[in-house]
Amino acid sequence: MRNKILKKSKSILPGLFICLIIGIIAEFLGKSFPTIGAATFAIFMGIFLGNTLFKSDKYDEGTKFSEKDLLNYSIVLMGASLNIIDIMALGFNGVFYIAILMTLTICTTYFIGRKLGFGEKYSLLMSAGNAVCGSSAIGSVSPVIKAKDSDKVIAITIVNVTGTILMILLPLITSILYNNDVLQSSALMGGILQSVGQVIGSAKFIGDPVVELATVFKIIRIIFLVVVVLVFAKIEVNEENKEEIAHHHKPTHKVRIPWFIIGFFIICILNSIGIIPGILGRTFKWISSNFEIIALAGIGMRVKIGDLVKEGPKAMLYGGLVGVCQIIFALSLINIFIK
């Protein structure tokens, strides 16, 4: 048993070490160029190095551990940065705005993906990534819908690139349409952008009050992650049971929630009721953020340039169309609910 663990650890270390180095460099570059962000640097450095200097199979176990296990741990610890009480801060209209916007984003993203000829599971991954919280949402949904690794890595890459573009674009829109009004600007950025880092980076163009309130809107979306995973898990189970019934078998599949989603929910509840001390919560948040960047480096290293060239242009069109739809939906809903 001990020898097996040592052997497994040795096989993981080379790839994990490269992902760690990429993550450290990406964090440094992200602070130097906050408009781009560490996540985008990590993914693209990973893609470049994984297809040039570090193509060897000896890095596979480490990159697989980074992109799967570290992302799962990141999702669990992310719960410490959330507080269910934040929902009350926005009131009914704010929560209703987020719920409707997320629903429209999921349905529209899935519809566009299928119309463009993408597979059902890739379209579901894009739906979750754009509607909820980018890489973490895709990582959460991927196992419950049994998505292919190639779909997962392409979806994460496209969602992060689209988010980076929107991060620059949204402050321009808010300045033109809302004259940088705090509430409306926060609702637009917090309701659309995929990651917390993108929300903060975009909101900083306007000011600290927008950073704080946009983050609250974003947190509500992340809290809804559990609901999205449950719904997607139910969809997958229904599809599997339909196949069994079609072959005259008794349906045997049940909804199974990944352990890290349960962990995320438990940590979120513990943080909301004040059991997790502030310093521990901040530590969890720091670890979660760094694990995610290392995971994104691993995801980048596992992207094959051939797959990216093959799917890239159409996938970027997909991401662009979804981004435009999100902006239209958000502007319309803000006009109704956020005044």
Swiss-Prot record:
Localization (cell): Cell membrane
Topological category with respect to the lipid bilayer: Multi-pass membrane protein
InterPro entries: UPF0324_pro
Membrane found in the keyword field: yes
Annotated TM spans: 12-30, 35-54, 90-112, 122-144, 156-178, 210-232, 259-281, 316-338
Protein name per its UniProtKB record: UPF0324 membrane protein CPE0129
Protein family (similarity comment): Belongs to the UPF0324 family.
Keyword terms, alphabetized: Cell membrane, Membrane, Transmembrane, Transmembrane helix
A Pfam entry, by short name: Cons_hypoth698
Location (main, coarse): membrane
GO cellular-component term (any): plasma membrane
Keyword Transcription: no
Highest taxon listed in the record's lineage: Bacteria
